[in-house]
Design a protein with these regions (language model features):
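Metalloprotease/metallohydrolase-associated module, dominated by Zn2+-dependent proteases
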Residues: 1-52, 69-106
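Active-site recognition of the HExxH zinc-binding catalytic motif
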Residues: 56-68
Length: 106
């Protein structure tokens, strides 16, 4: 498990989480809320977003990282959007499930 708060392990690869207002994405879209750089293993989240939106965007970008590390290089953005929105809601509706799994299932 990564020691630093801004590190996230995905399929054995360590991604760095960076929260900043400006980041250069592959298409330099200034309207992006987040971006997952697979080569550098960095997940960017736009700093000016609300805390709730940052969490939602993090789950979205983590979904991209998970699919990429699982070998899905071409990803359907609509599928990633739908899946990450639902997963974000599951986390909100079940706030203790992750805490439970960390302390009870280990």
């Amino acid at each position: 498990m990564p020691e630093a708060k801004n590190k996230i392990k995905v399929c054995g690869m360590t991604y760095t989480l960076k929260i900043q207002e400006h980041f250069k994405a592959y298409d330099d879209d200034r309207n992006l809320w987040g971006y997952c750089d697979y080569e550098q293993q960095i997940i960017y989240i736009r700093e000016s977003l609300s805390e709730q939106k940052k969490k939602q965007v993090l789950i979205h970008e983590l979904t991209h990282a998970i699919l990429h590390e699982a070998g899905y290089k071409e990803q359907d953005e609509d599928l990633v959007n739908r899946f990450s929105i639902i997963l974000h809601q599951v986390v909100i509706d079940n706030p203790n499930v992750l805490v439970f799994s960390l302390f009870v299932l280990n």
